[in-house]
């Protein structure tokens, strides 16, 4: 084959009793994906230096693993940093959403999610408990809302799906009728509070 199996799920299916998530992968499985991929990248001459150890590192709740390295496309090209991130298939749509569009759009979409009772990050969309303080961290052990596609995240939030090429800033976070979320009374109040906190 051309390298590691891009879906290591089959090897982990039976060992997922501890997880209530719809994705049975553990941090060890994510690490295994990276362990299979790195030798292929090194042998091709693409990966020229590792910045993290073989297993990479994950976030504290084990929702993904990251490996950082230095790559080079050819002998006469500049070196570039690469982050290889392995996410569970159950939350890949949130990871894709997080890494497309502008940082400003993502920041305001995440803030809109908070105003609507959700927590949105690259690790998934999570329904927050009632009366959860807007600025408080996401409670541990929340299962992500099932959103197989980016569009499902927008639908769950009651927002209009925005194509990645149109994700520029807060004016692109839209209600179903096309009205910018942040031009509404609730959105404007939340935006003012968020902007004050950023200063």
Regions from the language model: what does each represent?
Residues 3-11, 15-198:
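Acidic, metal-coordinating catalytic segment for phosphate/diphosphate chemistry
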């Amino acid at each position: 084959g051309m390298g590691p199996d891009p879906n290591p799920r089959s090897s982990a299916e039976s060992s997922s009793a501890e997880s209530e998530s719809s994705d049975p992968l553990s941090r060890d499985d994510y690490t295994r994906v990276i362990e299979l991929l790195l030798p292929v990248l090194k042998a091709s001459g693409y990966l020229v230096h590792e910045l993290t150890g073989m297993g990479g590192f994950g976030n504290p709740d084990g929702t993904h693993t990251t490996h950082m390295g230095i790559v080079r496309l050819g002998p006469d090209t500049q070196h570039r940093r690469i982050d290889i991130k392995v996410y569970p298939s159950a939350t890949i749509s949130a990871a894709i959403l997080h890494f497309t569009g502008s940082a400003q759009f993502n920041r305001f979409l995440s803030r809109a999610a908070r105003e609507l009772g959700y927590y949105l990050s690259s690790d998934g969309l999570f329904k927050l408990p009632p009366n959860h303080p807007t600025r408080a961290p996401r409670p541990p052990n929340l299962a992500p809302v099932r959103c197989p596609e980016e569009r499902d995240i927008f639908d769950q939030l009651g927002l209009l799906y925005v194509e990645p090429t149109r994700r520029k800033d807060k004016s692109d976070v839209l209600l179903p009728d096309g009205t910018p979320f942040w031009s509404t009374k609730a959105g404007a109040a939340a935006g003012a509070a968020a902007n004050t906190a950023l200063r």
